C-alpha cells in the first residue's frame, strides 16, 4: 500500500475537468492518484492510503456512488455532482462527506478539502 501524507484520490471521467483539478490540487501541496471509472477508483482505494477523495457521482463507466461507499469512514470525501438530490443521501449516511455542486470553484474545493482534513486531524487528536 502506498503511503503519502497528502494523497488524494480524484475519480472523474471527464479529462477537461480532471486535468485542471489535479493541477490545482498539486499546486496546493497534494499528491494525486486519479481514476476514470468506478472500477479504477475501487482499485486505487485498495492500493493507496489516502487522506481524502474527490469523487464525481456520474461516470460513464460505473457509479461514483460505489466508490464513495467503499472509502473508509475516517477518510473525508468530497462529492461533486450537477444533481444535488442524488448526493444528499450519501451526505446523510456517510460521515465526513460533503457535496460541492457543479459547476464548482477549484478554490472552494481546496478550501473545503483543507477544512475537512483539519476537522479529521482534530478528531484524531481527541481520540488517539
Model regions: which residues?
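Conserved acidic carboxylate
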Residues: 12
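Hydrophobic/aromatic residues positioned on beta-strands within the core alpha/beta folds
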Residues: 80-81
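Acidic phosphotransfer microenvironment of two-component signaling modules
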Residues: 15, 36-40, 107
Amino acid at each position: 500500500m502506498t503511503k503519502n501524507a497528502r494523497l488524494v484520490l480524484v475519480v472523474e471521467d471527464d479529462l477537461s475537468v480532471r486535468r485542471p483539478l489535479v493541477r490545482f490540487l498539486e499546486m496546493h501541496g497534494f499528491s494525486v492518484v486519479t481514476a476514470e471509472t468506478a472500477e479504477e477508483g475501487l482499485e486505487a482505494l485498495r492500493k493507496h492510503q489516502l487522506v481524502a477523495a474527490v469523487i464525481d457521482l456520474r461516470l460513464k463507466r460505473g457509479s461514483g456512488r460505489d466508490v464513495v461507499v467503499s472509502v473508509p469512514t475516517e477518510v473525508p470525501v468530497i462529492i461533486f455532482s450537477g444533481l444535488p438530490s442524488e448526493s444528499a443521501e450519501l451526505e446523510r449516511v456517510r460521515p465526513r462527506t460533503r457535496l460541492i455542486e457543479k459547476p464548482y470553484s477549484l478554490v472552494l474545493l481546496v478550501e473545503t478539502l483543507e477544512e475537512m482534513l483539519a476537522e479529521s486531524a482534530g478528531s484524531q487528536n481527541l481520540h488517539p
